């Protein structure tokens, strides 16, 4: 009997197995991973990504930007982490007041000469105080105001001024003695700071009548 590993005429030659061929896919996968990693490293160099820094402005080209923030600021604006201010719905401000009864002199009106209104038609934001008939600006911005103060069966000339923080800004007159009803009317755009106050003041004459004809209105055109 020949010894193990021995043939009839000499030692047997061992043939190499085919296990080495099974390693080729693993070697190929490793090479592919290395190539992909290299491409990822080279990508920023060939295709730079624009990022914001302290000096570069944000450039939006044909894209919509949606900013959400659950903590709006006190003036109704929402400021994102990118420093972009977005006005919320609470930034809407408008009022319009009228009278439901005739203008009658009172101790308060004789002392302050303020023209009072007793009915609010619109008061978005509740920044017009009916008791004092004073509007208080909730934020800095450009505001529009208009007024129509009617005198009825009164031959005296009246002068009505729109007051900002106690100082007259514009005035209107009604003094035609040949008509029974006449209105002192005017309008203006004002730059107002937060908590600035606006009201109407009778600078001259007396107010009698004017039931439901006198109005005072204003609204925020845009905030600053």
UniProtKB/Swiss-Prot annotation:
Q: Which PROSITE patterns match?
A: C1Q (PS50871)
Q: In the record, which residues are listed under signal peptide?
A: 1-51
Q: Which SUPFAM superfamilies match?
A: TNF-like (SSF49842)
Organism name: Mus musculus (Mouse)
Record-linked InterPro entries: C1q_dom, Cerebellin_Synaptic_Org, Tumour_necrosis_fac-like_dom
UniProt keyword list: Disulfide bond, Glycoprotein, Secreted, Signal
Q: Does the keyword Disulfide bond apply?
A: yes
Subunit-structure text: Homohexamer; disulfide-linked homotrimers. The trimers are assembled via the globular C1q domains. The trimers associate via N-terminal cysteine residues to form disulfide-linked hexamers. May form homooligomers or heterooligomers with CBLN1 and CBLN3 prior to secretion. Once secreted, does not interact with other CBLN family members. Interacts with GRID2, and more weakly with GRID1. Interacts with NRXN1 and NRXN2 long and short isoforms produced by alternative promoter usage. Weakly interacts with NRXN3 short isoform and not at all with NRXN3 long isoform.
Upon gene disruption, the observed phenotype is: Mice show impaired synaptic transmission within 3 weeks in interpeduncular target neurons whereas significant decrease in both the synapse density and size seen only after 3 months. Display impaired passive avoidance learning, spatial learning and short-term memory. Double CBLN1 and CBLN2 knockout mice exhibit gait abnormalities, impairments in balance and coordination and develop seizures. Synapse density in the hippocampus is normal in 1-2 months old mice, but severely decreased in 6 month old mice.
Q: Which GO terms describe its cellular component?
A: extracellular space; glutamatergic synapse; synaptic cleft; trans-synaptic protein complex
Q: Which PANTHER family match?
A: CEREBELLIN-2 (PTHR22923:SF50), CEREBELLIN-RELATED (PTHR22923)
Q: What's this chain's function?
A: Acts as a synaptic organizer in specific subsets of neurons in the brain. Essential for long-term maintenance but not establishment of excitatory synapses. Functions as part of a trans-synaptic complex by binding to postsynaptic GRID1 and presynaptic neurexins. This interaction helps regulate the activity of NMDA and AMPA receptors at hippocampal synapses without affecting synapse formation. NRXN1B-CBLN2-GRID1 complex transduce presynaptic signals into postsynaptic NMDAR response. NRXN3B-CBLN2-GRID1 complex transduce presynaptic signals into postsynaptic AMPAR response.
- Where's the C1q domain? 88-224
Name the Gene3D superfamilies on file.
2.60.120.40
Q: What is this protein called?
A: Cerebellin-2
For biological process, the GO terms are: maintenance of synapse structure; positive regulation of synapse assembly; spontaneous synaptic transmission; synapse assembly; synapse organization; trans-synaptic signaling, modulating synaptic transmission
Q: Which residues are glycosylated?
A: 53, 110
**Could you tell me in which tissues this protein is expressed?**
Expressed in various brain regions with higher levels in the olfactory bulb, cerebral cortex, certain thalamic and hypothalamic nuclei, superior and inferior colliculi and some brainstem nuclei. Highly expressed in the dorsal medial habenula.
């Amino acid at each position: 009997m020949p010894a193990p590993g021995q043939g009839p005429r000499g030692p047997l030659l061992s043939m190499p197995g085919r296990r080495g061929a099974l390693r080729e896919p693993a070697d190929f996968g490793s090479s592919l991973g290395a190539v992909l990693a290299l491409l990822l490293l080279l990508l920023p160099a060939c295709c730079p990504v624009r990022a914001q820094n302290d000096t570069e402005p944000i450039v939006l080209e044909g894209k919509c930007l949606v900013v959400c923030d659950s903590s709006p600021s006190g003036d109704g604006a929402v400021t994102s982490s990118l420093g972009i201010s977005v006005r919320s719905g609470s930034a809407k401000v408008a009022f319009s007041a009228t009278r439901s009864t005739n203008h009658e002199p009172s101790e308060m009106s004789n002392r302050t000469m303020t023209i009072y209104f007793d009915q609010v038609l619109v008061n978005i934001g509740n920044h017009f105080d009916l008791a004092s008939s004073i509007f208080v600006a909730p934020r800095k911005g450009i505001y529009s105001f208009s007024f129509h103060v009617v005198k009825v069966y009164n031959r005296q000339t009246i002068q009505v001024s729109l007051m900002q923080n106690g100082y007259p800004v514009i005035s209107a007159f009604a003094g035609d003695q040949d008509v029974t009803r006449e209105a002192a009317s005017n309008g203006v755009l004002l730059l107002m700071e937060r908590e600035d106050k606006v009201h109407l003041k009778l600078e001259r004459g007396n107010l009698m009548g004017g039931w439901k004809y006198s109005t005072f209105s204003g609204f925020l055109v845009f905030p600053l």
